[in-house]
């Protein structure tokens, strides 16, 4: 039986994953979905945005229905990309420079742009299985990784022309790697990290050739992570849990976030402040390398889904279930 479903890995993820619709089919069915270009429509500015990145001076955000939004004035105004070859939800975006970038989403979609996000081409999709990609990271315009459902990690060494699956370590007592991968990021040394399910961080110190699994010490799923200029690592996620590491991810301590609302995005601003956003309209800010956070909430409790620092100002650009949040 063919059906359209809301993606839900487990009950603890249901709140956040309300924003991640996916088309699926039962095992054994033939693919029932054909790619169609994203519509260009006025309501795109109110679409749920799930990922954002800097592309030089431009900010590019991706989200529901294949919507890609662009801002050339540091988040004051946005417009829709001219051509996107899919209507599936896009979850994350990464740019190697001001022109070349990649976006990933449901149905294993990988999109590629060479004009700063104005137009996109399809590099990969997988209509035969229901394994969405949640995160993407590139170093330069050749080496890249994309991570997603049930431990799916893809690697490219040619800018996404071809992808191969990478085998992650298997958790003791498990038969295969199956933890969902939510956020790829790197530090200034070049180490790679993946914030993942059940309080897990994966680390590679050799450019992604080998990986090790590190338990942060909490059971909560980690949805986002950042490497600060100081070298400190911060990961965060379900029910407001925040973990911090000062030794390259080998050991972690928990930071009191002051909230039970799940954290969906985190970034470091140019002035060194750290800003995290989350469900229920929550924002958290730290000025001491992530040791302490102050918390505030929007009166309307609108879910905040992504945050990126602007290239020229110490003002974050925030996205939500209703599109970009006005910059003050």
Please provide the spans of the model-predicted regions.
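Bacterial N-terminal signal peptides that target proteins for export
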Residues: 2-11
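Bacterial N-terminal signal peptides
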Residues: 10-19
């Amino acid at each position: 039986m063919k059906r359209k479903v809301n993606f839900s890995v487990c009950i603890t993820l249901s709140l956040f994953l309300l924003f991640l619709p996916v088309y699926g089919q039962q095992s054994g069915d033939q693919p029932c979905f054909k790619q169609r270009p994203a519509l260009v429509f006025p309501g795109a500015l109110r679409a749920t945005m799930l990922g954002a990145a800097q592309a030089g001076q431009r900010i590019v955000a991706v989200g529901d229905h294949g919507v890609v939004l662009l801002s050339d004035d540091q988040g004051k105004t946005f417009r829709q990309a001219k051509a996107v070859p899919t209507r599936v939800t896009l979850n994350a975006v990464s740019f190697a420079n001001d022109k070349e970038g990649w976006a990933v989403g449901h149905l294993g979609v990988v999109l590629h742009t060479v004009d700063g996000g104005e137009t996109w081409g399809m590099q990969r999709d997988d209509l035969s299985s229901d394994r969405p990609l949640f995160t993407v990271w590139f170093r330069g315009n050749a080496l890249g990784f994309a991570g997603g459902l049930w431990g799916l990690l893809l690697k490219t060494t040619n800018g996404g022309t071809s992808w191969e699956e990478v085998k992650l370590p298997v958790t003791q007592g498990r038969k295969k790697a199956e933890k969902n991968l939510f956020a790829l990021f790197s530090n200034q040394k070049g180490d790679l990290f993946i914030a993942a399910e059940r309080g897990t961080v994966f680390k590679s110190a050799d450019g992604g050739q080998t990986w090790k699994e590190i338990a942060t010490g909490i059971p909560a799923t980690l949805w986002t992570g950042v490497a600060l200029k100081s070298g400190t690592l911060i990961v965060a996620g379900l029910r407001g849990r925040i973990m911090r590491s000062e030794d390259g991810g080998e050991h972690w301590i928990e930071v009191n976030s002051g909230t039970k609302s799940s954290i969906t995005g985190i970034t470091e601003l140019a002035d060194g402040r750290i800003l995290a956003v989350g469900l229920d309209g929550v924002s958290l800010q730290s000025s001491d390398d992530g040791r302490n956070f102050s918390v505030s909430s929007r009166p309307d409790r609108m879910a905040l889904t992504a945050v990126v620092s602007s290239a020229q100002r110490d003002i974050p650009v925030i996205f939500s279930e209703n599109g970009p949040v006005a910059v003050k």
